[in-house]
Amino acid sequence: MWAGVAGLRGSCAGLQALWGGHRAALLLGRSPALHTSVASCGSKNLLKKFASKTRKKFWYEGPSLGSHLTPRPSKHEFLTKTTSKKTRKEDSIRLRVLNGLLYKSLTELLCTPQVSQEVYDLNVELSKVSVTSDFSACRVYWKTGVSAEQNKHTESVLQRSAAYMRHLLISQQTLRNVPPIVFVQDKRDLVLAEVDRLLAEADFGPPDERDDLDGLRNADAQVPHDSPEPAAHPNLCGIDHEALNKQIMEYKRKKERGLQCQSLAPPSGREQAPEPTRLLRKREKVRSRWQHRDASPRSFLLGEEDEDEDSSTEWECHAHEAEDDDDHQEEELGADRGAQRGLCGKREQG
């Protein structure tokens, strides 16, 4: 009890001291400021900090802190970019099966006008379907053409129809949950065609040079038909080709003349036939000369064959004429003998 009374007295004494000090300050400096203790203000600030729910603000904002100022990729870029997350073996098998199912279903949709007549008229051919490992996107690769404008138009039409195609796949119960479909150009065929073009250019040169070579070849091929042949030089390497050609043609004519004389054997009327032994000797001489004579163009050009040619042709002509005369004489003798036998028979009967 006495302790409580002593405490009250102490507090009253403190209040009086404070009031006295305040009055003294007003009298001396007439300042309206109040002097308070530092301990009481510090405790209030700490309580406010603990009671408030505001977080600490960062002065430097960056992508690691999730700032709203950093640029975010679009939805299309997010769906088309490759994922770096590694897949397990069982997940890869499951994804392979899903890719096959989606490829089959999407191919059937594109082959029918069920999606739209515009998509059906494009006649798009798919190369493969790839579902991401986190099942966030379904990338459908389609084969591009040569024209860049046509490829751009096809891509825009397919992207517009992607949501409706996803709705059709879900309604057909191909999968319970089909990820968003994104159509991606498969440029593998274009890359292969570019590689073939570069290899052909490395082997045969650029197209301009190849066209020039083709034009030169065609010009060479058309020269014999369009323009007359240039006249050959008469003397080449010291040889008169014109005279040589004449000699060759003369040699050919003589050969043909000899063959014609051998084949022709017309009857020359009744003439005195040579003796048989003489004819046989002439034939043997002709045969031996034809067998052993040199019938090459070289001997003809050197003039070694002219005499043999003339003599052999004459002997052969005489031999054929003699043979024809012998045959004709034998026929006449046979006719005369038949006539004589007929006369003898008539005389005997008379």
From Swiss-Prot:
It is found in: Mitochondrion. Belongs to the RbfA family. GO terms for biological process: rRNA processing. Residues 334-350 have a biased composition (Basic and acidic residues). Keywords: Mitochondrion, rRNA processing, Transit peptide. Pfam families: RBFA (PF02033). The keyword Repeat does not apply. GO terms for cellular component: mitochondrion. The keyword DNA repair does not apply. Its main location: mitochondrion. Residues 1-41 form a transit peptide. Residues 203-237, 255-350 are annotated as: Disordered. Residues 303-313, 322-333 have a biased composition (Acidic residues). This is Putative ribosome-binding factor A, mitochondrial. Residues 279-290 have a biased composition (Basic residues). Gene3D superfamilies: 3.30.300.20. It comes from Mus musculus.
